[in-house]
């Protein structure tokens, strides 16, 4: 699951925006 910073940040940003998996990533 290694991706460029831009792609990783984009996916993380979308997930955090939803807030559904924000907790999963946070922990």
Curated annotation (Swiss-Prot):
The EC number of this protein is 2.7.4.6
UniProt keyword Phosphoprotein present: yes
Q: Which UniProt keywords apply?
A: ATP-binding, Kinase, Magnesium, Metal-binding, Nucleotide metabolism, Nucleotide-binding, Phosphoprotein, Transferase
EC class name: transferase
Coiled coil spans = none
Q: What cofactor is this protein dependent on?
A: Mg(2+)
What is the annotated role of this protein in its UniProt record? Major role in the synthesis of nucleoside triphosphates other than ATP. The ATP gamma phosphate is transferred to the NDP beta phosphate via a ping-pong mechanism, using a phosphorylated active-site intermediate.
* Protein's recorded name: Nucleoside diphosphate kinase 2
Species of origin reads Pseudotsuga menziesii
């Amino acid at each position: 699951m290694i991706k460029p910073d831009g792609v990783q940040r984009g996916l993380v940003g979308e997930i955090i925006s939803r807030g559904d998996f924000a907790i999963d990533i946070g922990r």
